[in-house]
UniProtKB/Swiss-Prot annotation:
InterPro entries listed in its UniProt record: GPCR_Rhodpsn (IPR000276), GPCR_Rhodpsn_7TM (IPR017452), Olfact_rcpt (IPR000725), OR51/52/56-like (IPR050402)
Biological classification of the source: Eukaryota, Metazoa, Chordata, Craniata, Vertebrata
Glycosylation sites: 6
UniProt organism field: Homo sapiens (Human)
Protein name: Olfactory receptor 51Q1
Gene: OR51Q1
Family the entry assigns: Belongs to the G-protein coupled receptor 1 family.
Its membrane topology: Multi-pass membrane protein
């Protein structure tokens, strides 16, 4: 009974879970994990630097790419502290305030990533279907307002779930099933009525997993319809190639996201290792893969990187 009393006080803590069955191999596991985090940080930082410094990529479409890189960087830095301190120092305890803060930024950046990809699909649609009006429709002011609206909407979407969760008592085991704090993981430790929290979380998940992808599919359906009406196959392939990077980024985000949701909903009794691996793929795949996708598929980003690196080498001599 004393445990219940203590866990409802302010100074509670949570216990993070490492990779089950591999506790003795933390140092070895940390090497590839650290490499992935390094790729994410360096890749997204490089893209941001190139977009900021290279005149050849000072175009409106790259403002959305810079938003995506900033979001990926935020997502990486949100999970980095708990994951690496667990693997390097076996520090599994996290205070409730730190856990709630990570919960807020983790879900906020995840929702932001989805919203930015939706905005990028609209950008592709306008560029391909209304090329003559692109500059007048997507002005710098419109893009700036879009970015501000995305931030405000994501913050306002996550805050209610944070406050709803903070008001509840935690009186079950403090053991989380992952190495960071997620809403669906924390809510199962509550010993009170969680119907409101569950319904709100379900509504948010529905919005991110169904509504955003549906709008993206609609935009690409309209793009495809427009492309099929063009004169030559060369024009069709060129238009599709311009959108290929964005399509890959969408798949990299939503396939792991759906996988995590399905695992949480329908495979609750699966091995803890499955849940940990799925969650890590979901949070690491987009920040790691997006810089690679855009640097490989986008020639202007490639040239921008080469110019940036060559200028850097000249200044260092």
């Amino acid at each position: 009974m004393s445990q219940v009393t203590n866990t409802t006080q302010e100074g509670i803590y949570f216990i993070l879970t490492d990779i089950p069955g591999f506790e003795a191999s933390h140092i070895w596991i940390s090497i590839p994990v650290c490499c992935l985090y390094t790729i994410s940080i360096m890749g997204n930082t490089t893209i941001l630097t190139v977009i900021r410094t290279e005149p050849s990529v000072h175009q409106r479409m790259y403002l959305f790419l810079s938003m995506l890189a900033l979001t990926d960087l935020g997502l990486t830095l949100t999970t980095l502290p708990t994951v690496m301190q667990l693997l390097w120092f076996n520090v599994r305890r996290i205070s409730s305030e730190a856990c709630f803060a990570q919960f807020f930024f983790l879900h906020g950046f995840s929702f932001m990533e989805s919203s930015v990809l939706l905005a990028m699909s609209v950008d592709c649609y306008v560029a391909i279907c209304c090329p003559l009006h692109y500059a007048s429709i997507l002005t710098n002011e419109v893009i700036g307002r879009t970015g501000l609206a995305i931030i405000c909407c994501c913050v306002l979407a996550v805050l209610p779930s944070l406050f709803l969760l903070k008001r509840l008592p935690f009186c079950h085991s403090h053991l989380l099933s992952r190495s960071y704090c997620l809403h669906q993981d924390m809510i199962r430790l509550v010993c009170a009525d969680i119907r409101l929290n569950s319904w709100y979380g379900f509504a948010l998940a529905l919005l991110i997993i169904i509504v955003d992808p549906l709008l993206i599919v609609i935009s690409y359906t309209l793009i495809l319809k427009n492309i099929l009406g063009t004169a030559t196959w060369a024009e069709r392939l060129r238009a599709l190639n311009n959108c290929l990077s964005h399509i890959l980024a969408v798949l990299v985000l939503y396939i792991p996201m759906v996988g995590v949701s399905m695992t949480h909903r329908f495979a609750k009794h699966a091995s803890p290792l499955v849940h940990v691996i799925m969650a890590n793929i979901y949070l690491l795949a987009p920040p790691v893969m997006n810089p690679i996708i855009y640097s490989v598929k986008n020639k202007q980003i490639q040239w921008g990187m080469l110019n940036f690196l060559s200028l850097k080498n000249m200044h260092s001599r």
